[in-house]
Amino acid sequence: ADGSDPAGGEFLAEGGGVR
């Protein structure tokens, strides 16, 4: 949830995170 994946579904506005 820190921005590892731009298409992640945890913090989209933060940069992604966990998918």
Swiss-Prot record:
Q: Which GO terms describe its cellular component?
A: extracellular region
Q: Which compartments does it reside in?
A: Secreted
Q: How is it modified after translation?
A: Conversion of fibrinogen to fibrin is triggered by thrombin, which cleaves fibrinopeptides A and B from alpha and beta chains, and thus exposes the N-terminal polymerization sites responsible for the formation of the soft clot. The soft clot is converted into the hard clot by factor XIIIA which catalyzes the epsilon-(gamma-glutamyl)lysine cross-linking between gamma chains (stronger) and between alpha chains (weaker) of different monomers.
GO process annotations (BP): adaptive immune response; blood coagulation; innate immune response
Query: Does the UniProt entry include the keyword Secreted?
Result: yes
Record function comment: Cleaved by the protease thrombin to yield monomers which, together with fibrinogen beta (FGB) and fibrinogen gamma (FGG), polymerize to form an insoluble fibrin matrix. Fibrin has a major function in hemostasis as one of the primary components of blood clots. In addition, functions during the early stages of wound repair to stabilize the lesion and guide cell migration during re-epithelialization. Was originally thought to be essential for platelet aggregation, based on in vitro studies using anticoagulated blood.
The record's note on its domains:
A long coiled coil structure formed by 3 polypeptide chains connects the central nodule to the C-terminal domains (distal nodules). The long C-terminal ends of the alpha chains fold back, contributing a fourth strand to the coiled coil structure.
Subunit and interaction comment: Heterohexamer; disulfide linked. Contains 2 sets of 3 non-identical chains (alpha, beta and gamma). The 2 heterotrimers are in head to head conformation with the N-termini in a small central domain.
Please state what the protein is called. Fibrinogen alpha chain
What is the native source organism of this protein?
A: Alces alces alces (European moose)
